[in-house]
Amino acid sequence: MRRFLINQAKGLVDHSRRQHHHKSPSFLSPQPRPLASSPPALSRFFSSTSEMSASDSTSSLPVTLDSINPKVLKCEYAVRGEIVNIAQKLQEDLKTNKDAYPFDEIIYCNIGNPQSLGQLPIKFFREVLALCDHASLLDESETHGLFSTDSIDRAWRILDHIPGRATGAYSHSQGIKGLRDVIAAGIEARDGFPADPNDIFLTDGASPAVHMMMQLLLSSEKDGILSPIPQYPLYSASIALHGGSLVPYYLDEATGWGLEISDLKKQLEEARSKGISVRALVVINPGNPTGQVLAEENQRDIVNFCKQEGLVLLADEVYQENVYVPDKKFHSFKKVARSLGYGEKDISLVSFQSVSKGYYGECGKRGGYMEVTGFTSDVREQIYKMASVNLCSNISGQILASLVMSPPKPGDDSYDSYMAERDGILSSMAKRAKTLEDALNSLEGVTCNRAEGAMYLFPRINLPQKAIEAAEAEKTAPDAFYCKRLLNATGVVVVPGSGFGQVPGTWHFRCTILPQEDKIPAIVNRLTEFHKSFMDEFRN
């Protein structure tokens, strides 16, 4: 079984390992032997990777697994782990051995990377970026025939805030002040409460902001972070890299991945009894990998819990635009805290946003920010110092973050086309989510909670005992065994639930809803045929 190599989760994993006798797979371990039913090309692939691993192990180079930072060995990131590595090799082999496989393409359902799967960027955003990057176009008469008037106006305004009017220049370490002003205004419009641009730190996506906060809060294994299980593995990985302890709390699958305050209290008390100083609570809303959207009442309970226990609330809100059901609505934790009357001196709150998700999906542009509230001035100086070490985030990402929080408004030249693009993407995501949800729930032994938000489904698979035993023989987790077999048979890439964490003895996988609509029927057909064949092969 893949384990969370975090001290506080270790006991849970050891319990599960005693039940199932699995070892944690490693990307440096030799690949498992191909299944008897594997095509010859797959056999060649596994053979070549095993030989490569063996030659690596005899290297006399000065850097070895024994000499590198052990914290690096402790962290894992399943979203781009072993199965994805296999898929990438298969994709290369398909170019020259297309007839050797039972599929003609690899379909990546493993990661929230919309544009890699055919989603088009928002035209207004790209027009503004193009004009900012090639500012001389603004002086050309032809530009007014090629670009919308509001994208031209926005580009002028943005360039006025950039040092030297050049996107290749460094900026302030927190990000360009004029762009932070725009983002603060967008937050204020969203929440109905004031936002201060000096609280905003622009980063290369949300991930560096998470790392920055872990670096700030964790000094040893005696410092812990309450993190959900299942969780986005950025959190377990960053906690490991920065030397802290992950304190897991389990989301309740039976109630649609609900967050129970009673479980938070139990895990907090248990950690404290072991001498761990729990510093913060991570909440992902909408959920990744689980796709739930928290009710506002639940959020109030969470805020009150953090206030009472003196915990920093780390609010991962990068999917705030991705809500697909009419009975749920996104509410920021800052809005909830302010609605309860908690101000700067009452609760420490860090909220994360990214240009990679939502309806924009600009993953490669690496834009995002964190809004840091409820910290003393001397601590804020230390946060700024950490930001300064990295000089600044990239300017294109900064511009996109400002555009995401201040898109075209009614009356703007681009407004109608922007709304058509936005609504089209979100409605299509909702349709794809429902189609995949229904398909998964139709499979034998599979249950999938409602897709309320984010970009993922996290179905539970009840595997036959013979399949679990076959996985044990290959020294891999049963859900990873299932996902490898799925990849080898169909070319569809999903991520085992063991990479996100799950209740011991349960098995899941994460599947994105991002392949375009014309690909969904093929995914459903491939998955349905594979699952039936798999269950028939291993039926008890």
UniProtKB/Swiss-Prot annotation:
Name of the protein this chain belongs to: Alanine aminotransferase 2, mitochondrial
Residues recorded with modification N6-(pyridoxal phosphate)lysine: 357
Subunit structure: Homodimer.
Processing and modification events after translation: The N-terminus is blocked.
Biased composition (Low complexity): 28-40
Family: Belongs to the class-I pyridoxal-phosphate-dependent aminotransferase family. Alanine aminotransferase subfamily.
GO biological process, any: biosynthetic process
Tissue specificity comment: Expressed in shoots, essentially in leaves and flowers, mostly in vascular tissues. Also detected in stems and roots.
Domain of life: Eukaryota
Location, primary (coarse class): mitochondrion
Lineage, opening ranks: Eukaryota, Viridiplantae, Streptophyta, Embryophyta, Tracheophyta
Keywords assigned by UniProt, alphabetized: Aminotransferase, Mitochondrion, Pyridoxal phosphate, Transferase, Transit peptide
Record-linked CDD domains: AAT_like
Catalytic activity: L-alanine + 2-oxoglutarate = pyruvate + L-glutamate
Organelle transit peptide residues: 1-46
Span list, region Disordered: 11-40
Gene Ontology CC: one annotated term: mitochondrion
Native organism: Arabidopsis thaliana
Cofactor: pyridoxal 5'-phosphate
Localization per record: Mitochondrion
Pfam families xrefs: Aminotran_1_2
